[in-house]
Swiss-Prot record:
Zn(2+) binds at residues 195, 198, 218, 224. Low level in fetal kidney and lung, and in adult prostate, ovary and small intestine. A zinc finger (B box-type) spans 137-184, 190-232. PANTHER family: E3 UBIQUITIN-PROTEIN LIGASE MID2-RELATED, E3 UBIQUITIN-PROTEIN LIGASE TRIM36-RELATED. It comes from Homo sapiens. It comes from the Eukaryota. GO terms for molecular function: enzyme binding; identical protein binding; microtubule binding; phosphoprotein binding; protein homodimerization activity; transcription coactivator activity; transferase activity; zinc ion binding. Homodimer or heterodimer with MID1. Interacts with IGBP1. GO terms for biological process: host-mediated suppression of symbiont invasion; innate immune response; negative regulation of viral transcription; positive regulation of autophagy; positive regulation of canonical NF-kappaB signal transduction; positive regulation of DNA-binding transcription factor activity; positive regulation of NF-kappaB transcription factor activity; protein localization to microtubule. The lineage of its organism: Eukaryota, Metazoa, Chordata, Craniata, Vertebrata. This is Probable E3 ubiquitin-protein ligase MID2. One of its GO terms (cellular component) is extracellular exosome. Residues 516-709 form the B30.2/SPRY domain. The tripartite motif (RBCC; RING- and B box-type zinc fingers and coiled coil domains) mediates dimerization. Associates with microtubules in a manner that is dependent on the C-terminal B30.2 domain.
Length: 735
C-alpha cells in the first residue's frame, strides 16, 4: 500500500530539516578538532576557536619544556590573521557566548534517534567501515570474561559499549548527549590516523607539496605552513579517480596479457604437437633412407659376386687352354730332344724331318696355339665411390620456408595498362614457385590488421584463419587470376619476373611477391608501382576548321587559310574560339599530361563532357573546367565563373592531372614543381581533354607518369585568389 499524504509531507519536511541541521552543524564545527565548538573563543577577526584548540596551537609553538607565557601572538587557522595576546594570554580573549548557546540548542535538537541530522551524518561517515567489518566487536567496558557484544561505538570516547555498559556510562544528560554514537566499528578504524609530527592530532588535510597527510597544526605552525594543502575529500576523490582509471587500464592490460599468454600456451602446445610430428617424420624418412641403403648394399654385393663368378669362370677356361697347349708343346719338345741325341745320320735324317716340320709349325703358329689372355682383367676397374651420396647425406636437414624475395623497383617497367614486375631471391634453389599478388593502392586500408588475418598483411591465403574473405575464396573463379576482395593472385610463376595486363591507366598498385616451397612461404615487402597515363592525340573530327593538326596529332596551330573541313556536330564551330579535343573519353583512373604553350598568349586548357557546347569557349558552361590565359591574366574558369591564379613569369608548360576516381582536376607548373589550382568535381560522365587557342600553337605531351612532386590524392595549396577576374565583364573581348 502507498504512503499517506500526511506521511509523505512529514518525511519530506523531515528530510528538509535534516539537510538544514547538517548545514548548521558544519558551521558549528571547529577548524582544528573538527568537532562542535567547546568553550569557543571569539577572535578579533570574527572567527571562533575552541579554547583547548587555541591552547594546543600555543603549545605546539613552544620548544620542549618551555612555557607558553612568552607567546604573544598566533595565527587564525581560518583566515591566517595574526591574533595578538595581552598579559592574560588566551584568558584575555572574549568568550563567544552566543555561539555556545546555539551549540547547546543544536545538541538538544539532535539528541537520540537515527534520523537526526548529526546521527545520519555520522552513520554515513562510518558506514563503509561498518560494512567492511563483519567480525564480532566486543564491548571494551565489560569486566566479565568474555565481554558482551558491542551495540554502539562512541566516537567521542573512542570506545565500543554493550547495551548495559552504554546505559551505565552515557546517561541522557549533559555532556553525554553530545557524544556521537554509531554502529560498532573496530578500534583500528575508530581511532583513525594520527599526525606524524603531532601524535595527539588526527590528520585532516593533505600537503600537496610534500605529498603527505598532515593535521591542522602542521599547516598553522608546523613545517607545512607555507605549503599548498588540499582537503582530504578533494585529494581522496582525485586519487580514487586516478587509481580507478589506472586500475581499469591495468585490468585491461592483464586481460590482454592473459589472451596473449593463452595464445602463447596454445603455440607451445602446437610446438609440442608439431615437434612430435616432425620427429616421427624424421624417423620415417631416415628409416626409408636406411632401407634404401640396405637394398642397394645387397644389390651391389650380389653384382660383385656375380661378376666374380663370371671372371673366375673365364680365367679357369683360359688356364685350362694354356695347360692343354703346354702339354702338347712339352710332348713335342721331348720328341725333338730325343731325335737330337741320334748320332746315326741316316736315322736322324729319317726321323728329324717330320719332327722339324712339326716344331717349325708349332713355333710359327704359337700365337694361334696359345689363347688370347687379358692380364689386366683382374677386377681392378671396379670402384665404389659414394662421396657424392655422402655429401648429400651430410647435407640432410629439415626444409624451411624460403627467404622473402625483394622486388627490384628500378627494373620494373610500366605502360598505360601493363606493369612488369622484377624481383630477386637469395634462396632460389629451395623455391618451387612464386606467387604475385596485387591490388589498387587506396592508402592504409590496404593493410589489414591481425584480427583479419593471422599473418598481419593481407593476403596470406594459405594460412589465413579469421579473414572474412576466406568464405569468398571457395567460390572464386578458377584460372590464372583468383580474386579475394580487391586482391588479385597470379600463382605458379617459375621466373623472376611477370607482366600484368589489363590494368587501369594512371593508377597506383601494391605488389607483393610470395616465395613458396613445401615448408611454407614468405612475402616480399609491399611495393607501390603505377601505370602511365592513357596516351591520346588530337581528334581531327572535333578540331575547329581554322586549326591545323600536325601529322602526329600532338600539335595544333591557328591557320586562317584552312577552310576545307566540313562542318559536323562534334566539331568546334565558334567564331571566337578555336578548339580541339583529345581522341579519348576518360571515366576512371588518374591521368597526367602536359601542354607546351610556346609563345601563345590566348588559350584555355582543361576537360569537358561530350555534351559541352562547341560554339563557345570551354569553361563558360557547367560541362567544362579550364585553366586559361588572356594576355597577362591567368584564371581558372567553370560555369562562367573565374578566379585569378598567381602564376610564375614565363609559364611555358602546363601540367594537367585528372584524378577521376577522387573527383579532382589539378593544374601545375612542372618547371617549378608548383601547384596552381585544383577543381573539386563530382564527375557524372566521361570527360575529354579539351584545348582552345586564339593565337600561335599548342603541343600536347600525353601518356606521361605523374611527376614525383605530385603526391596525389593529397590536396595541396593552390595559388588562386577568390575574387572576380578584372576582365570578367569584358569577356567578349577575349572570345
Amino acid at each position: 500500500m502507498g504512503e499517506s499524504p500526511a506521511s509523505v509531507v512529514l518525511n519530506a519536511s523531515g528530510g528538509l530539516f535534516s539537510l538544514k541541521m547538517e548545514t548548521l552543524e558544519s558551521e558549528l564545527t571547529c577548524p582544528i578538532c573538527l568537532e562542535l565548538f567547546e568553550d569557543p573563543l571569539l577572535l578579533p577577526c570574527a572567527h571562533s576557536l575552541c579554547f583547548s584548540c587555541a591552547h594546543r596551537i600555543l603549545v605546539s609553538s613552544c620548544s620542549s619544556g618551555e612555557s607558553i607565557e612568552p607567546i604573544t601572538a598566533f595565527q587564525c587557522p581560518t583566515c591566517r590573521y595574526v591574533i595578538s595576546l595581552n598579559h592574560r594570554g588566551l584568558d584575555g580573549l572574549k568568550r563567544n557566548v552566543t555561539l555556545q548557546n546555539i551549540i547547546d540548542r543544536f545538541q538538544k535538537a539532535s539528541v537520540s534517534g537515527p534520523n537526526s541530522p548529526s546521527e545520519s551524518r555520522r552513520e554515513r561517515t562510518y558506514r563503509p567501515t561498518t560494512a567492511m567489518s563483519s567480525e564480532r566487536i566486543a564491548c571494551q567496558f565489560c569486566e566479565q570474561d568474555p565481554p558482551r557484544d558491542a551495540v554502539k561505538t562512541c566516537i567521542t570516547c573512542e570506545v565500543s559499549y554493550c547495551d548495559r555498559c552504554l546505559r551505565a556510562t552515557h546517561p541522557n544528560k549533559k555532556p553525554f548527549t553530545s557524544h556521537r554514537l554509531v554502529e560498532p566499528v573496530p578500534d583500528t578504524h575508530l581511532r583513525g590516523i594520527t599526525c606524524l609530527d603531532h601524535e595527539n592530532e588526527k590528520v585532516n588535510m593533505y600537503c600537496v607539496s610534500d605529498d603527505q597527510l598532515i593535521c591542522a597544526l602542521c599547516k598553522l605552525v608546523g613545517r607545512h605552513r607555507d605549503h599548498q594543502v588540499a582537503s582530504l575529500n578533494d585529494r581522496f576523490e582525485k586519487l580514487k579517480q586516478t587509481l580507478e582509471m589506472n586500475l581499469t587500464n591495468l585490468v585491461k592490460r592483464n586481460s590482454e596479457l592473459e589472451n596473449q599468454m593463452a595464445k602463447l600456451i596454445q603455440i607451445c602446445q602446437q610446438v609440442e604437437v608439431n615437434t612430435a610430428m616432425h620427429e616421427a617424420k624424421l624417423m620415417e624418412e631416415c628409416d626409408e633412407l636406411v632401407e634404401i641403403i640396405q637394398q642397394r648394399k645387397q644389390m651391389i654385393a650380389v653384382k660383385i659376386k656375380e661378376t666374380k663368378v663370371m671372371k673366375l669362370r673365364k680365367l679357369a677356361q683360359q688356364v685350362a687352354n694354356c695347360r692343354q697347349c703346354l702339354e702338347r708343346s712339352t710332348v713335342l719338345i721331348n720328341q725333338a730332344e730325343h731325335i737330337l741325341k741320334e748320332n746315326d745320320q741316316a736315322r736322324f735324317l729319317q726321323s728329324a724331318k717330320n719332327i722339324a716340320e712339326r716344331v717349325a709349325m708349332a713355333t710359327a703358329s704359337s700365337q694361334v696355339l696359345i689363347p688370347d689372355i687379358n692380364f689386366n682383367d683382374a677386377f681392378e676397374n671396379f670402384a665404389l665411390d659414394f662421396s657424392r651420396e655422402k655429401k648429400l647425406l651430410e647435407g640432410l636437414d629439415y626444409l624451411t620456408a624460403p627467404n622473402p624475395p625483394s622486388i627490384r623497383e628500378e627494373l620494373c617497367t610500366a605502360s598505360h595498362d601493363t606493369i612488369t614486375v622484377h624481383w630477386i631471391s637469395d634462396d632460389e634453389f629451395s623455391i618451387s614457385s612464386y606467387e604475385l599478388q596485387y591490388t589498387i593502392f587506396t592508402g592504409q586500408a590496404n593493410f589489414i590488421s591481425k584480427s583479419w588475418c593471422s599473418w598481419g598483411l593481407w593476403p596470406e591465403i594459405r594460412k589465413c584463419k579469421e579473414a572474412v574473405s576466406c568464405s569468398r575464396l571457395a567460390g572464386a573463379p578458377r584460372g590464372l587470376y583468383n580474386s579475394v576482395d580487391s586482391w588479385m593472385i597470379v600463382p605458379n610463376i617459375k621466373q623472376n619476373h611477370y607482366t600484368v595486363h589489363g590494368l587501369q591507366s594512371g593508377t597506383r598498385y601494391i605488389f607483393i611477391v610470395k616465395a613458396i616451397n613445401q615448408a611454407g612461404s614468405r612475402n616480399s615487402e609491399p611495393t607501390r608501382l603505377k601505370t602511365n597515363s592513357q596516351p591520346f592525340k588530337l581528334d581531327p573530327k572535333m578540331t575547329h576548321k581554322k586549326l591545323k593538326i600536325s601529322n602526329d596529332g600532338l600539335q595544333m596551330e591557328k591557320d586562317e587559310s584552312s577552310l576545307k573541313k566540313s562542318h559536323t556536330p562534334e566539331r568546334f564551330s565558334g567564331t571566337g574560339c578555336y578548339g580541339a579535343a583529345g581522341n579519348i573519353f576518360i571515366d576512371s583512373g588518374c591521368h597526367y599530361w602536359e601542354v607546351v604553350m610556346g609563345s601563345s598568349t590566348w588559350y584555355a586548357i582543361g576537360i569537358a563532357y561530350k555534351s559541352a557546347p562547341k560554339n563557345e569557349w570551354i569553361g563558360k558552361n557547367a560541362s567544362s573546367w579550364v585553366f586559361s590565359r588572356c594576355n597577362s591574366n591567368f584564371v581558372v574558369r567553370h560555369n562562367n565563373k573565374e578566379m585569378l591564379v598567381d602564376v610564375p613569369p614565363h609559364l611555358k608548360r602546363l601540367g594537367v592531372l585528372l584524378d577521376y576516381d577522387n573527383n579532382m582536376l589539378s593544374f601545375y607548373d612542372p618547371a617549378n614543381s608548383l601547384h596552381l589550382h585544383t577543381f573539386d568535381v563530382t564527375f557524372i560522365l566521361p570527360v575529354c581533354p579539351t584545348f582552345t587557342i586564339w593565337n600561335k600553337s599548342l603541343m600536347i605531351l600525353s601518356g606521361l607518369p605523374a611527376p614525383d612532386f605530385i603526391d596525389y590524392p593529397e590536396r595541396q595549396e593552390c595559388n588562386c585568389r577568390p575574387q572576380e577576374s578584372p576582365y570578367v565583364s569584358g569577356m567578349k573581348t577575349c572570345h
